[in-house]
Amino acid sequence: LVACTLTILAGSCREDAEVICPNAIQQEWAEAEIGVLLHMDMQVFVPDYNWRNYGSHPDPSAFNPAELDTDQWMETASKLGARYAVLVAKHGSGFSLWPTEAHDYSVRNSSWRDGKGDIVADFIASCKKYGIKPGIYANTNANGYLYTDRGRVREGGPVSQVEYNAVVAKQLTELWSNYGNLFEIWFDGGVLTPKEVGADVLPLVKKLQPDAIAFQGPLGHDNLIRWVGNEQGTAPDPCWATADSTTNSDGVKIIEGLHGRPDAPFWCPGESDFTLRYNTSFEGGWMWHEGQDSLMFSLDELMEKYETSVGRNTNMLLGVVIDNRGLIPDADVRRITEFGEAIRKNYGTTTVRTSGKGSNLTLKLPAPTLVDRVILQEDIAKGERVLTWHLEGVTPSGETLTLCDGTNIGHKRIARFDPVGVVSLHLVADSYKARPIIRNFAAFECLN
């Protein structure tokens, strides 16, 4: 790290102005930045199976990942730089990766380990071993085994709506009671309320996992995060961490307010999820299918997704497939490892950096340097304060150039611009709702 000079011109506003601030748990989640979402379901073993063809579910004996190794999963996640991992414990088929007591369609009746295994327990143990925070996805809205889609039981199924809701409550109770504290809980498609015929999830999460971050969780939970409106790893720009209640649930339909609002009443930041493969691949790239390695995103494409997710004030959640052996495929391990190395190469070591309070920060470089990107970070413990900003560069000849501009900064903004040789950079907060507190203003030398 190179020493640099800081100049601060204070803005005319109160430092203690009223702004929405995250709690300590939400701050910890923002610091995590990178997670993985691990997928394995019955389709991995029976590719022609469509869980919406009710009554056609494969026999549970078809599920047999004979080489399953959750340590391999977490070792790979570590190479990416992931701080947390979310296991899809039950996806659309209804097949459950733990020996649930709620119904018979689970590992308890599979060929794998003679029905005595528990993938959720193995996953939690591996997370602890590798220092990765664990999370669980359990889809409350879809269950092909019980003829349910979007939270509503279809005609001809084995259970009533009331019985299905009891299954949901029992399974969530098992997952939230038997495996310790969870860092994140994933509600795919949001949560139907009891008024919408759904199970009463809010009291359960408040009682059993009050500290968990909840993706698209029930309104009333303290630690909500929201969908960004796509599964491409591209957060909207701007993407404020404060949002209205309408943006934190029901990802099934197109919803308004995906950008959030700087004056919204809830701290509810975005999480950008995407797969390692193009969405034209099997199950949108979320599930493994033999022969689709060529559909993986290139390293350049993945780096762009990092910059449009983490670099736009959201966390990045990479979808990772588990194959029919129970392993992350070799080709995927290589690409994920390369992705992590590229993130660290591009953003692990700054050329210069500083921090400070006020509407104008100056970053002096030790010598004329060709730069092409900066990282900006607010101290979000004091809320998001900057509304608009621009970046200036001073060339060796003394010319001042406007390099880029933007709206929100939040936890992290990565701003790229055409390479330019500069001796100093100036960050100017053009508008703000309280005195800006910049915890990190970092410049990076052009690598190419």
Language-model features, listed with the residues they occupy:
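Bacterial Sec-dependent N-terminal signal peptides
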Residues: 1-17
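Mature catalytic domains of secreted/periplasmic carbohydrate-active enzymes
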Residues: 16-419, 426-447
